[in-house]
A protein has these predicted regions:
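Short linear sequence signals and composition-biased patches located at protein termini or domain-edge surfaces
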Residues: 151-209
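A generic structural micro-feature
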Residues: 88, 107-111, 141-146, 181-185
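Structured surface patches comprising rigid loops and adjacent beta-strands/short helices at the edges
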Residues: 68-71, 144-156
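A short, polar/proline- and glycine-enriched secondary-structure boundary/capping micro-motif
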Residues: 106, 134-143, 165
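Periplasmic/lumenal scaffold domains of single-pass inner-membrane subunits
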Residues: 124-127, 132, 142-144, 150, ...
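N-terminal single-pass transmembrane signal-anchor helix
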Residues: 1-31
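Short, mixed charged/polar active-site loops
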Residues: 112-114, 140-142, 199-202
């Protein structure tokens, strides 16, 4: 007894097309979501790298803080080895003399480096001079360290283990003309970065020596 082959009915075709469309939509949505997740993950990884790089550079600066005052660009006075402003609107907020400036190519320049930190337009920026005693015409090498920053606060621990909001402390500010006073270093530096996405990040750097 023979049987006849029959084709799909219109209803069956519509159901099959609907199922195929649904599977395509689900597959596309999954791929699209995976791509979004991948982009978000990369963004988070880039942000983490930015934060870690910022912290590492600040650590290298403060750990290698040297007691080396510099001449003022104008006049005969000197600036302290470390000058930290208590006014958060003052620029630069911190400037310091540091050692350990690597010179792999053997360029004729000092092994010490004068570094300054600026906070402008929600960005923490690091600048350094190529000479230790800059003049007005001296230029700096600039690098944005961290973006999306709401505020930056520095504190400095003195030998009595008391935190100061400026450096040199107000107790020695009247003796700023003495070169020995300008060499005074804290035993530790605390930085607080209030960021838009990670909240407050606090690090304490112990000053060597």
């Amino acid at each position: 007894m023979s049987t006849r082959q029959r084709g799909f009915t219109l209803l069956e075709l519509l159901v099959a097309m609907f199922i195929a469309a649904m599977m395509f939509a689900i597959g596309y949505g999954a791929i699209n979501q995976a791509m979004k997740n991948q982009d978000a993950l990369k963004e988070q990884q880039d942000r983490m790298k930015e934060i870690l790089t910022c912290m590492r550079m600040m650590e290298q600066d403060f750990v290698q803080l040297e007691p080396r005052p510099i001449r003022q660009p104008i006049g005969d006075g000197y600036l302290p080895a470390l000058l930290g402003q208590s006014d958060p609107t003052a620029q630069p907020i911190v400037q310091l003399s540091r050692g350990g400036w690597n010179n792999p190519t053997g360029v004729q320049r000092p092994g010490l480096q004068r570094v300054a930190y600026y906070f402008e337009k929600n960005t923490l920026r690091r600048e350094y001079y190529t000479v230790m005693d800059p003049v007005q015409q001296s230029t700096t090498v600039k690098r944005d360290l961290l973006t999306k920053v709401k505020s930056v606060t520095f504190r400095y621990m003195d030998v009595a283990r008391v935190w100061q909001t400026q450096w040199p402390p107000t107790s020695v500010a009247g003796a700023m003309a003495q070169l020995s006073t300008l060499r005074i270093r804290p035993i530790a530096v605390e930085v607080t970065l209030d960021t838009e996405d990670w909240g407050k990040l606090v690090r304490i750097f112990e000053v060597a020596g």
